Amino acid sequence: MKYDYLVVGAGLFGAAFAQMAKEKGKRVLVIDKRSHIAGNIYTEDVGGIAVHRYGAHIFHTDDEEVWQYANRFATFNRFTNAPLAKYQDRLYHMPFNMNTFYAMWGVTKPNEAREIIERQRKEITGEPKNLEEQAISLVGRDIYEALVRGYSEKQWGRPCRELPAFIIRRLPVRFTYDNNYFNDRYQGIPDAGYTAMVEKMLDGIEVRLNVDFLQHRAELTKIADKIVYTGPIDQYYDQCFGALNYRSLRFETRDLPVQDYQGNAVINDTNADVPYTRVIEHKHFAYGQADVLNLPHTVVTYEYPADWKQGDEPYYPVNDAKNGALYEQYRQKAAGERNVIFGGRLGQYRYLDMDDTLRAAIDCARKELQ
């Protein structure tokens, strides 16, 4: 059978493109080298708890069309992301707000917190030369040392003084007692998990798992008129310009015989001597679902940053000048392709929130299918 589109990758971008193509009457085949669909938003039921296998994913957006599109395939709960950060056995609210400032300095009034931050920001004069100077110029020395430095150095595997300033464009600071991490109008998590959502997106579409496109490229390229490729763009071109760099992650998941382990969905650990960056307790994502919250067990995941090497799962692009220039070479080469569309975080070598991924997929499909 000849397909109109071969979609490489059953993650959010690939699933959305495939769904829209099928809706337009196109013949679509979706393949994925993993044994499951949904990519990194894959959720798996463990004793009644939807476990986010590749780290916490909270859907949030201000994009009305994207929100309505997502709601075609899932009913979202009202989960509000309010993470905590642990530093030297004390807990601080994220993002930085009046609860954070009270815990750190004992201040209760917004103007008191502003005065401290403004005074500490003045330590940096001129254009920040690295991540450390950038962070201090935004939030001051105290917050940087307690809540930014250790976490960032673990996440990127390098001292903050060696990291480029542009990694942190901004650090959200609120002078209210609002613990909601996101400012977006819409926020939540699918009641049935992300895997069920992607299953509905792919309903009626042929899906083949455990198929590595790069290993079977010769035969696969013959069965479709066009390819939508969501894998690493450098690997598509056999790394002809060199390998793009990534950061990887390692997850250690435990099923514990207690009803509640930490009382919150996500607690970051900013201590430099603690190897993991955060602990996720998955049942707390099930907002309003008493049957889940009251289960006599819980599932927690420790998230460890890791250096990436060939063969490892790539998670975050390393957005420095070297990799940016290298990606630009691949982007220009890809621009000359007539029958290949590159999309998603790996195909575009950029970090994408879920709503950004859906927006990119919707726009791409709309342009392609018009």
Predicted regions mapped to residue ranges:
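Mid-domain catalytic core of redox enzymes
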Residues: 24, 214-333
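Short, solvent-exposed loop/turn segments at secondary-structure junctions
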Residues: 12-13, 35-37, 99, 153, ...
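C-terminal catalytic lobe of FAD-dependent flavoproteins
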Residues: 313-370
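Beta1/beta-strand and adjacent pyrophosphate-binding region of the FAD-binding site
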Residues: 1-13, 29
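Glycine-rich FAD pyrophosphate-binding loop
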Residues: 17, 22-47
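A conserved beta-strand/loop capping segment in the N-terminal third of enzymes
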Residues: 39-52, 59-113, 171-176
